[in-house]
From Swiss-Prot:
Stated role: Displays ATPase and GTPase activities.
Record-level Gene Ontology MF annotations: ATP binding; GTP binding
Annotated residues for binding of ATP: G8, R9, S10, G11, S12, G13, K14, S15
Residues annotated as binding GTP: D56, V57, R58, N59
Entry protein name: Nucleotide-binding protein Sden_0486
Keyword line: ATP-binding, GTP-binding, Nucleotide-binding
Record HAMAP family: RapZ_like
InterPro entries for the chain: P-loop_NTPase, RapZ-like, RapZ-like_N, RapZ_C
Family (UniProt): Belongs to the RapZ-like family.
Top-rank lineage group of the source organism: Bacteria
Length: 284
């Protein structure tokens, strides 16, 4: 089992780091009481071997000592990585002022600046224990995400899930699509009597559409579009991409195009899911 511990001063980007971990498949728990670490891992052992927790000033009581004790009790095969995120006092003050969020220690009679300084002192025991320190003072959300991925994976690239869905316009458009292509202008197998009862997954329909130059050109252009822009979509903190292909009834043209695109995108780098809505969720 792998355990990642994320700590740091409020406003330094812990929530961003947790989102990255969640996208990587980690079961994330924010502000877990430290004595519960062992119980959490034992409970998740059979269902999830990737776990991430955040530790912050809200469960402060002798954190460093308690954390050290809890980690010593974990099974020896547990792989532990830890991060401490920090920013300069000036940057943290600016971030809290801009977002108008309440600092966890501001409920007492102290100023925001005093709360920020006190939090830094309280978290010093944790900061001395961790493997990786990240100063986020000059980082934006995307740069911080890349750094976390780089440390965990050895690369800033992440596995983008591509969902390709065929549908029929007469049954309504899918609401979850990021990109939608209307292929109703392509030659329609519906008008071929012997092809009408078949679908775009059947060989006779595939052979019919494969003979159409317009079909080849469209597939090539869609593939080229995403090959060009996919790296930029991946760097934009995106975990999945949904591409919808629509024809009139969702039986022939859209099914064939979606099926062909799924095969072309399945190059090992991406997880590709093909769904044909009007065929009762049949997978390609």
């Amino acid at each position: 089992m792998k355990l990642v511990i994320v700590s740091g001063r409020s406003g330094s980007g812990k929530s961003v780091a947790l989102r990255v971990l969640e996208d990587l498949g980690y079961y994330c728990v924010d502000n877990l009481p430290l004595p519960l670490i062992g119980s959490l891992l034992a409970q998740l052992k059979s269902s999830n071997d990737l776990v991430a927790i955040s530790v912050d000033v809200r469960n402060i009581a002798e954190q460093g000592k308690v954390l050290e004790q809890q980690l010593a009790l974990l099974p020896p095969e547990t792989e532990i990585s830890s991060f401490f995120l920090n920013s300069s006092d000036k940057v943290l003050l600016k971030r809290f002022s801009e977002t108008r969020r309440l600092h966890p220690l501001s409920r007492s009679q102290m100023s925001l600046q005093e709360a920020i300084k006190l939090e830094g002192r309280l978290l010093e025991p944790i900061a001395k224990m961790v493997d990786h320190h990240i100063d986020t003072s000059l980082l934006n959300v995307y740069e911080l995400s890349d750094q976390v991925r780089q440390i965990l994976l050895g690369s800033v690239d992440k596995e983008l899930v591509i969902n390709i869905e065929s549908f029929g316009f007469k049954h309504g458009m899918p609401t979850e699509a990021d990109f939608m292509f209307d292929v109703r202008f392509l030659p329609n197998p519906h008008w071929e009597t012997e092809l009408r009862p078949l679908t775009g997954l059947d060989v006779p329909v595939q052979e019919f559409l494969a003979r159409q130059p317009l079909v080849h050109k469209l597939i090539w252009q869609i593939e080229n579009l995403f090959e060009t822009w996919m790296p930029h979509l991946e760097r934009n903190n995106r975990s999945y991409l949904t591409i919808a292909i629509g024809c009139t009834g969702g039986q022939h043209r859209s099914v064939y195009i979606a099926d062909q695109l799924a095969k072309r995108f399945a190059n090992g780098k991406h997880v590709v899911n093909a769904r044909h809505r009007e065929l009762g969720d049949v997978k390609a």
